[in-house]
């Protein structure tokens, strides 16, 4: 991959920084693994906005990605690496020995033509998926399941990874990139190595229109609104919020903890907040 600073031919391109990967497939994606998806612009079935700052954007198909990696003992060859508009990581099209093709999250360092394996007998090599029971302590992993057989839910974004810290009984301890230490069942699967496209965070959008292409609408500050629209609104001329930061609905924000899922609290050994 290469970091490309665009020639400043306009104000929008002056600050633009691109991440270019010449190894990505330049043709169309694999059609049998595409699915249609419609945009809701952040509205629910009643037409009410449930997620702000969504709307517009370019149309694209959903790539059906295999997060379970459950074809055990069958070798898979990486046919090509592709861009996926639905996520920050790139994806890899793999061809199994029995003729089936699947998309997977492309791990760091995996190249076209490389052989990948899944299952408890797979070697400890980047891109291979094993139950955590069979992964050595201290190994860097990604695409981690939270429930056995459900599919990977943690460490799936570009450049992310986790570390297997310990195993005790039926649970293992995993340290996530945020600093949180979490318990997962040893039968949950994880992939060796880090997620690829690690330079994704170095890109600079450059102009507001590039976010509109991605379906991201503007974020208006509360102090720029009227009192009817936001607790920070109102005042004569430019004024401060006049209170601690809150959301449009009055909930404290900017660091205020809102997690309420007590059901899985016992699985968190150490929270990402150090205080």
UniProtKB/Swiss-Prot annotation:
What PANTHER family does UniProt report for this protein, alphabetically? LARGE RIBOSOMAL SUBUNIT PROTEIN UL2M, RIBOSOMAL PROTEIN L2
- Which residue intervals make up region (Disordered)? 28-59, 224-275
Compositionally biased, Basic residues: which spans? Answer: 50-59
- Gene expressing this chain: rplB
In the record, the note on similarity to other proteins reads:
Belongs to the universal ribosomal protein uL2 family.
What organism does the UniProt record list as the source?
A: Paraburkholderia xenovorans (strain LB400)
- Keyword Transmembrane applies: no
Listed Pfam families: Ribosomal_L2 (PF00181), Ribosomal_L2_C (PF03947)
Q: Name one GO biological process term.
A: cytoplasmic translation
- Protein name per its UniProtKB record: Large ribosomal subunit protein uL2
List, as start-end ranges, the regions of compositional bias called Polar residues. Answer: 35-49
The GO terms this record gives for MF are: rRNA binding; structural constituent of ribosome; transferase activity
């Amino acid at each position: 991959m290469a970091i490309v600073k665009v020639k400043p031919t306009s104000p929008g391109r002056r600050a633009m920084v691109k991440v270019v990967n010449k190894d990505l497939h330049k043709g169309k994606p694999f059609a049998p693994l595409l699915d249609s998806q419609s945009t809701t612009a952040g509205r629910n079935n009643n037409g009410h906005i449930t997620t702000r700052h969504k709307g517009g954007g370019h149309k694209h198909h959903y790539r059906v990605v295999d997060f379970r990696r459950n074809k055990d003992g069958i070798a898979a060859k990486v046919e090509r690496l592709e861009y996926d508009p639905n996520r920050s990581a790139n994806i890899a099209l793999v061809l199994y020995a029995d003729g089936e093709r699947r998309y997977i999250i492309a791990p760091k360092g995996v190249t076209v033509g490389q052989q990948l394996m899944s299952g408890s007998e797979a070697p400890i090599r980047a891109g291979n998926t094993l139950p955590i029971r069979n992964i050595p302590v201290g190994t860097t992993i990604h695409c981690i399941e939270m429930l056995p057989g459900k599919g990977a839910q943690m460490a799936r974004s570009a450049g992310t990874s986790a570390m297997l810290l310990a195993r005790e009984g039926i649970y293992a301890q995993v340290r996530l990139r945020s600093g949180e230490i979490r318990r997962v069942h040893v039968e949950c699967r994880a992939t060796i190595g880090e997620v690829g496209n690690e330079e994704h965070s170095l890109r600079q959008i450059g102009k507001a229109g590039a976010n509109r292409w991605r379906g991201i609408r503007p974020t208006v500050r509360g102090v720029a609104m009227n009192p009817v629209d936001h607790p920070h609104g109102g005042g004569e001329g430019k004024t401060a919020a006049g209170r601690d930061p809150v959301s449009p609905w009055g909930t404290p924000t900017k660091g205020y903890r809102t997690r309420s899922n007590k059901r899985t609290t016992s699985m968190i050994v150490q929270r990402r907040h150090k205080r």
